[in-house]
Amino acid sequence: MASLIYRQLLTNSYTVNLSDEIQEIGSTKTQNTTINPGPFAQTGYAPVNWGPGETNDSTTIEPVLDGPYQPTSFNPPVGYWMLLSPTTAGVIVEGTNNTDRWLATILIEPNVTSQQRTYTIFGVQEQITIENTSQTQWRFVDVSKTTQNGSYSQYGPLLSTPKLYAVMKYGGRIHTYSGQTPNATTGYYSATNYDSVNMTTFCDFYIIPRSEESKCTEYINNGLPPIQNTRNIVPLALSARNVIPLKAQSNEDIVVSKTSLWKEMQYNRDITIRFKFANSIVKSGGLGYKWSEISFKPANYQYTYMRDGEEVTAHTTCSVNGMNDFSFNGGSLPTDFVISRYEVIKENSYVYIDYWDDSQAFRNMVYVRSLAANLNSVTCAGGDYNFALPVGQWPYMTGGAVSLHSAGVTLSTQFTDFVSLNSLRFRFRLAVEEPSFAIMRTRVSGLYGLPAANPNNGREYYEIAGRFSLISLVPSNDNYQTPIANSVTVRQDLERQLGELREEFNALSQEIAMSQLIDLALLPLDMFSMFSGIKSTIDAAKSIATNVMKKFKRSSLASSVSTLTDSLSDAASSVSRGSSIRSVGSSVSAWTDVSIQITDVSSSVSSISTQTSTISRRLRLKEMATQTEGMNFDDISAAVLKTKIDKSIQISPTTLPDIVTEASEKFIPNRAYRVINNDEVFEAGTDGRFFAYRVDTFEEIPFDVQKFADLVTDSPVISAIIDFKTLKNLNDNYGIGKQQAFNLLRSDPRVLREFINQNNPIIRNRIEQLIMQCRL
C-alpha cells in the first residue's frame, strides 16, 4: 500500500550510505569544555541573558537597573524610581519638602506583636507603635506628618517577601508601593514643591526610569535579578553615576573570522531612529456631518544625522499592528455627527520601525547571526483635530499618549519607490500615558491610547537613540556584493522555495485522476520509488531518503508514535474501565497527547464529542499498528503526494524533506475512523462528530463511549474513506445491499474502483473532497 512510505519513515527501514552516517555523526558531535572563571567570578549567581557576546556600552542607552548605590542624602530626579534594598529592620528612607510633608518608611521584620519602638526620624527620636502579624513576610510602613511638630500617622503597608521598596517623585506626588507581594501596586501622597523633596536613604538603592515602571513592579513583587544584570557588582557612591567612563568605540567593524572568499564581520553601531506616523481621514458622503474612517497607515521618513563625525543617511518605515477600533454615533439624523471607525493604539498594540542607513553594516545584510539591540523609550503624544461641520460648533479630538518600549529586533526588507532595502525591524510594545484623549463637545472623554487623528501633534518626527550589534557573513573582498535572491536569510531562501512549492502542490490537486489515484494507492510504494520523479539514480535516492528521515523524525507524528507504541493497548483498556462519561474523560490521559500541537483535553470533558475527537486522533496510530486489507487515509495521502511530486516542476532534494513531513501532518486533516461490531458500526471523526448506526438500515443508534473504547482496544480500526454521511446519501439515492455496504465500510479498494469507474457522483465527490484536503 502507498502508506508504506510513512511506515518506512517511522521504522527507519531503509538503507543509507556510510558516508551519510559519518557526516551526521560529525555534525552532531558534542565536546566537553572546562572553563576557569577566575577569581572575580560571581559563582553564586547563574547567568540569565544569553546574548551575542560582547557589545560595547554606550552613553546613549539609559540602563534599566542603575546601581546599586551606597546610602546617601540627595534630591532624586523627577520621574525615576528609587528602588530600596534594605538588609535589616528600621528606618530605610526619609524625605521632606520642609513645608507640608515629612515622610519616612520603616521596615518591620516578620512575626512582631503590637509594641512601641523608638526610631530616629529626621534627627528626632520618635515613639511609633508597630506590628507585623505575618510569619514569613517583611512589612514596610510609611509614617507621615504635615507639620514639623505634628505626630506621625501610618499609611500604605506593604507586605513583602523580596524585602524591596520603591519611591518616586512625579506629577506633583510622591509615589510608593502598597499591598502584598506578588500583587503589590503603586499609591501616592500629594506634596507641594515635590520636585525639591530631598531623600535620605539608609540602605543600598537602585535607580529605575519611570518608563520601566513595569520592571520596577516586577522587582518589587518577585525580587532582583542575578547580579550580572545590574550595572555595578558592588554598591558605589552616588557620585560615580556622574562620572563619564572611557568607553570603547561604539561604532566599529570587527573581523570575527576570515577565509579566502568569506569573512564574518561584527558591526557595532550607535543609531538615531527618527520616525513619524501617517494617517488616513476619510469623510462620508452626504451633508458633511459624518466621517467613515480615521486610520493609521505606514509612513516613510528619510533623514541625515552625524555619527562619529560622519554624516549618515537613514531611512525608516513606521507601521502599527493591533489597532483598536472605536466609533462615535451622535444619532441617526443626516445632521448628526458620526465617526464610523477611528483607530487607537494602546497597550495591546505594537509599533514596527524598519531602519536602514548607508553604512557598511547594511551593505551585505544577507546572512546574519547574533543580532542584538538596545533602544531608549519615547513618548508619543497626540494633538488636536477639528471636525469641520457645515453648521454649529465643531467637535475636536484632543489628547492621548503612549510610550514606546523596545521589544525586539529582526531582519526585514523595506520597499521604497525605487529599491528594496535589507534593513532592521525594531519592534516596540506600548504603554498608555497621560493625558487621556477626548472628543470635545461630545460625551467621549477619559479614554486612553493614541488616536490616529493627529498622532504627530505637529512634530516633524519622533526620535529614539540606541545601538545594535550583528555578525554578518560577507565576501572577503569588500568590493563584492553578497549574492541575494530576494531574500534576507538563508532560511528565508528555503521558505520562499517552500512557499512557491506549496502553491504549486495545492494547484495540482485538480489534475489528479481519481481512478489512477486509487490504483496508485494500492501499490506498495517504497522510499525509492517515491523519489524516482526527482532523481533516477539509486545513490541519489538513498541520500534523499536519509535527508527525509532526518526531517521526519522530528515531526509530531513520529514523536507521538515513539511515545505511544508501548502504551496503546493499556490506554484503550484504561478508557474502557471508566464508569461514566466524566470518568472516561479523566482516564484517557494516555490517549490525549497525540502530538505537541494537541492540547490535553482531560480538563475539558464536558461532552462525548470532546472525548471521541480526542480518541480519534489516536486511531491513526492504532490503524498503523493493525494494518487491514482496506484502503486508509494515509494510502490516499501518500498516493497524492507521489502524484504531485511527479508532476511538480519545482520540487528539489532540498525542499523534499519539508514537503514529505508537512504532508504527513497536514494532508487530510478531517479524518474519520470506524470500528465494526457485528451489524453495528461506531464512527468518530477528528472534528468531534460521532455516529453509531446499523449496517443493514443505516439507522442511527445511541453512541456508547464505553463500548467504543472497548472495541478500539480489541478490533481493527478502519479509515472511514466513505463516511456515514456519504453512505446514507448513497443508500437513499441508489440503494445498496448489505454486502456492498460492508465492503464500503471496510474501504474495500476493489469496490471503490468500481464506483469510480461507473462515475457514481456521490462516491466521486467524496474522493474529490479527500484529494482537495491534501493541501499544504
Swiss-Prot record:
Coiled coil stretches, renumbered: 484-511
Annotated site residue numbers, Binding to sialic acid: R101, S190
GO BP, sorted A to Z: permeabilization of host organelle membrane involved in viral entry into host cell; virion attachment to host cell
Region of interest: Spike head: 65-224
Record bears the keyword Membrane: yes
Residue numbers spanned by region Spike foot: 510-776
SUPFAM superfamilies membership: Concanavalin A-like lectins/glucanases, VP4 membrane interaction domain
Site (Cleavage): R231, N232, R241, N242, K247, A248
Region spans: Hydrophobic: 389-409
One Gene Ontology CC term in the entry: viral outer capsid
Motif placement: YGL motif: 448-450
Other facts noted in the record for this chain: In group A rotaviruses, VP4 defines the P serotype.
Protein name per its UniProtKB record: Outer capsid protein VP4
Annotated source species: Rotavirus A (isolate RVA/Human/Israel/RO1845/1993/G3P5A[3]) (RV-A)
Highest classification ranks of the organism: Viruses, Riboviria, Orthornavirae, Duplornaviricota, Resentoviricetes
